[in-house]
Curated annotation (Swiss-Prot):
Cysteines paired by S-S bonds: none
BP GO annotations: L-histidine biosynthetic process; methionine biosynthetic process; purine nucleotide biosynthetic process; tetrahydrofolate interconversion
Entries under HAMAP family matching the protein: THF_DHG_CYH (MF_01576)
Name under which the protein is recorded: Bifunctional protein FolD
InterPro entries: Aminoacid_DH-like_N_sf, NAD(P)-bd_dom_sf, THF_DH/CycHdrlase, THF_DH/CycHdrlase_cat_dom, THF_DH/CycHdrlase_NAD-bd_dom
Molecular function terms, GO-annotated: methenyltetrahydrofolate cyclohydrolase activity; methylenetetrahydrofolate dehydrogenase (NADP+) activity
Native species: Dictyoglomus thermophilum (strain ATCC 35947 / DSM 3960 / H-6-12)
Catalysed reaction, written as an equation: (6R)-5,10-methylene-5,6,7,8-tetrahydrofolate + NADP(+) = (6R)-5,10-methenyltetrahydrofolate + NADPH; (6R)-5,10-methenyltetrahydrofolate + H2O = (6R)-10-formyltetrahydrofolate + H(+)
Length: 283
């Protein structure tokens, strides 16, 4: 059986570092503050928001909410983001997806201040990531990097295949890996020789959003498999990788749940603390 790359010890290490920084801010009278912005009603988005609230409350980070009706206008949404940008007591802003169809079509997240963009989704932060400048990294891709670092898995000079090309995970993760001198191949729904490419990889990352998409015929002996998928099947959380089918074949594999997801919320907290630093530097 391959080595299980548990997310818990990585999360615990990061959480310890986060708490230490929060205590330092407390001595200065600063309480890190995140504003969660939500449009309409969505059960998954609400569950995600509550999980963040529980974790942040436990470690000493304040969370406030800004809720909008489904039919909120682009102008009203833009105005609210501008007010949050000017509010020095709000250090970071998290916009829950999905937005309304109109706001998604208008790409409303572009009105988010890059300095408070703790998810690294604005064009400015993504552009800086592309050229290798200091910026907020998208949380899930950075969580993968934190896991690789913790387990001392180097990607330098290795063939890495990322299955998935989303703007929030697949593309930014590919850049982060490329910046570490990996040879990266991005695969997607139109890739013709997908199985051949995934079997060739030394490190395989599944971020396609389809339950159990990666099976035993798509992996090879000794491979490192990182599963980013979060799919609900019959009430259970499962990954993009068929864990039971491939675990005895590969060398290393992350579980779902218990893998990348638990690290992602810690990265969000780390980004928020960086936003606090930016805010203090401006003031």
């Amino acid at each position: 059986m391959g080595v299980i790359l548990e997310g818990k010890p990585v999360a615990e290490k990061l959480e310890k570092e986060i708490k230490e920084k929060i205590e330092i801010y407390k001595t200065k009278g600063i309480i890190p503050n995140l504003c969660i912005v939500k449009v309409g009603e969505n059960e998954e988005a609400e569950a995600y928001a509550k999980s963040i609230e529980r974790f942040f409350s436990r470690i000493g980070i304040n969370v406030e909410r800004k809720n909008f009706a489904e039919n909120v206008s682009l102008l009203e949404f833009q105005k609210a983001l501008k007010e949050l940008e000017k509010n020095n007591k709000v250090h970071g802003i998290l916009i829950l997806r999905p937005l309304s169809e109109e706001l998604e079509r208008q790409k409303a997240f572009r009105f988010l201040s890059p300095d408070k963009d703790v998810e690294g989704i604005t064009y400015e932060n993504l552009g800086k990531l592309f050229v290798g400048e200091k910026c907020f990294h998208p949380c899930t891709p950075q969580a993968v990097i934190e896991l690789l670092d913790f387990y001392k898995i180097s990607v330098e000079g290795k063939d890495v295949v990322v299955v998935g090309r989303s703007i929030s995970v697949g593309k930014p993760l590919s850049i982060l890996l490329l910046n570490r001198n990996a040879t990266v191949t991005i695969c997607h729904s139109k890739t013709k020789n997908l199985e051949e490419l995934t079997r060739r990889a030394e490190v395989l990352v599944a971020a396609v959003g389809r339950p159990h998409f990666i099976g035993k015929d798509m992996v090879k002996e000794g491979q490192v498999v990182i599963d980013i998928g979060t799919n609900v099947v019959e009430g259970k959380l499962v990954g993009d990788v068929n864990f039971e089918e491939v675990k005895d074949k590969v060398g290393y594999i992350t579980p779902v749940p218990g893998g990348i997801g638990i690290i992602t919320t810690r990265v969000l907290a780390m980004n928020l603390l960086k936003a606090v630093e930016k805010n203090e530097a401006r003031n």
